[in-house]
């Protein structure tokens, strides 16, 4: 276009303008200025240039033709002024303009045509490139598939040829397996077989233990008919398959004379074919041999095999339905109703579950979930509510595939025909699958038939909670919205059968647990049921649980809107399904479950909700909740001393039977009236007053509630503390204000004091009240159980026991003078259940800004010998805890100065303490922080003397000795360590022996790996390392020992020197002094080496010759020869070999990770060594060592074949 314009400009000379039209000599054209035209940066090819020239020629030709037709072509226009153009008519000018417009249109069309041609050429080239790439890709894929197919066929042909070769040999007599006898892998099992056959002294259990050593999972199955020799053959099959020699495994498989005992081998062979990807061979092998073994293959083995096939098909993108059909065709053989019974229903259901399509939320719901994850906290709850109300949706493909995979008609018919053969767990699993399937596929008939089976044939008392939860899910979530008849049918069925249920039925408890579950967000109820539901796979109620939060505050972290939404859905379900007169019983029982599960807040929520809805009489639930909580928390262990009525003795035994609803009507009519009056007063007189002053008064009252303790409380104090109780009328406001940290004790004490206050209003004085209670005890026996009525708070209160928290007052002057700390400490209610309740209460007390303890009185109490001698370990710890005032954080000795200031720890106190506790309790005390105190302070406090005096009374000193060493108890200081060690030596020389050489326990601790043990101190903080004082302590005490021990003692224990050397070597290794350790080793005769010594030697050699492996092997082999030579000289050839294999070889094997075991195996006569192992086996040989020695075979086998 630009080139054309330039050409035209050059040709245009002698222009003359007429009414906006430029007349050109020879031709005319309308020219306009295009200010927006941009020049192209692309390079024009020769082809494009030629094309452009031809186009211009055509264009010129068209323009000339037009101008020839014009009457103006005869007129030559020269450059003249405008007035010289006068004389032309309007018509002539218009004709000329029209021709000019035609010319312009022709040019425009030509340009469009040219652009289209260029685009077409580009598109054509792009398509050609794509076609070329596609062809190359297809060619490459085809080549890879052919290559893979060839490889697979080659492998299969190779395996089949080997199998045919083996099968063609008559009785395998011509097959030479003698080469196997020369390899260590196979010599060990043959030795084992000979050993088992020839050894008559071992029991069957010992033989099983030996055979079990071949397996990492331990003992062989305890099946009576299994022949040990045949079972060992499966060991050989497994060994061959591990080294990819299936032909040898097949040899042993076919060699078995009794095929029925070799089912293990069959499964191993099939698993091997699956592992190498030869599914056809696996199925063929399975099908050919299945008939011989189907009666012996366990359900678990079937399941493992099936899972292996499914996993393979998924990993390799095989058709899962083909795999499934092949598998079931082999097992079922067109007779499903008979053979499928051999299939454990639970396993079958689990298989179905493993390949069941999972629910995927619809796109709009997923969007809500995505929005929720990206939104701020203010919008989280709204999205969750939207999400939680949606129905389950499954696409047609999902349902279709599911129907292909599982024939539920057959499954259901099997269930109906074999109902009595199933356990309750199996029924639960299979019914869950059927229910789930019917919901997914919207099969109303199957769903109703199944529910009818659950409710009618099974009876709801046999229905477990997950089934009920599925029905609840179906009712509220999963039933398709276009199937209202399903909801109606379900409601009808549930309502009819729940209405006639007796409270003794199991189903009664199940429904109550279901209610408790839907109100509980923590504890055993929640966890156990939630796990079961997740296992079944039904979409459960979505609850935002944060597992890292303390249970006591978990519910407060859940989003309020979501919680209420789900709870309300469940309440609607309960109220629409359950008959009105039955809801109360279920809710009452649910309350019991919640309370027993320590879900107090949830119980209160449940209680308040039904009170608010009016479907349950609030006061009745309140009474039962209050009484039960009171029993469980406050006076669980106290006896009812004031109950003089013998008729009630039997009823008192029912106090702990919290699961029977009939035992909770223990309040007399007078109690009901009193509490009902109180309750009505609260409900009717509540006024919502926003006055700040009144709110502050209420908060002050609430704060006072926290510090009311257990035990007897003076009514005068209550009157003073709760003078504003009438204004604080609504108990619900108390719950709401303490939702963040509601403590059951707060609630109980709050209720207790309110009731006492009401009783004070209704009765003249306490004496009259007590008299009334006694009268009630005599007159209200028909009310059943418990305390026989009356004011339970007063009749059950121990008169002489004051609570510790009652000492918390506004000032010390208010401390009751009658309280004795011995009574506090000896109150058993403080120490029951491993002090759980007490610790919780104590912790809140000590952390409270209002807490004040009479430390001086506690000090005087603790420093009294008669007191401390009668105290238990736990009681003393709590007293010290109180003095330390650290809030029960298990480090109350941390600040020694604080303890010294607040408590006079006398030597007498410590000696009394540590001489009465056991060794474990001493260690516990030490762990709690005494190790942070310097030995000097320990000595000055007398604690050290007390510790050792307690130790010397206990014969088991090794744990404490190890503990002392690990914690660096004996450090570099002026502290007289020698005298204490001397005390131990003088008392029990064996104690000192263990004290100095806990190296054996190191083997147990670190699994026998000396390298890990030697690095142990490096992983710890340097100030707490065990070996900080090692250099100057243990070696020095070797001399101490010998000085304290007589020559006779040493001669009686010749291994002492070895043990001391071992510990010296280990100490030097940990100090990094390998040269000194090596010298110590060389100074010790090899004949005195034991297993620990050899382990240390191998470790040091591996470090010393780390850069020269050949030198290392030479030294090790030389060492072995020296050891055997010295041992033979000392104890004879046979004993020496037995000793060698018992200790030396064991150490080499235990520490194989620290040495070049590959090279050692390659250079040592391994078959001879293994033969020596066999020769060393004797009836009195350590069974554990037998197991370890045979486990060596697996490692040597692996290493040997990797090298060869």
UniProtKB/Swiss-Prot annotation:
Disordered as annotated region, ranges: 32-55, 360-387, 639-660, 761-797
TPR repeats by residue range: 263-296, 379-412, 583-617
Bias-annotated ranges (Low complexity): 32-48, 374-387, 766-778
The lineage's top-level taxon is Eukaryota
| UniProtKB keywords | Repeat, TPR repeat
Tell me which InterPro entries the record gives: Glucose_repression_reg
Identification of the protein by name: TPR repeat-containing protein DDB_G0287999
Q: Which species does the entry assign this protein to?
A: Dictyostelium discoideum
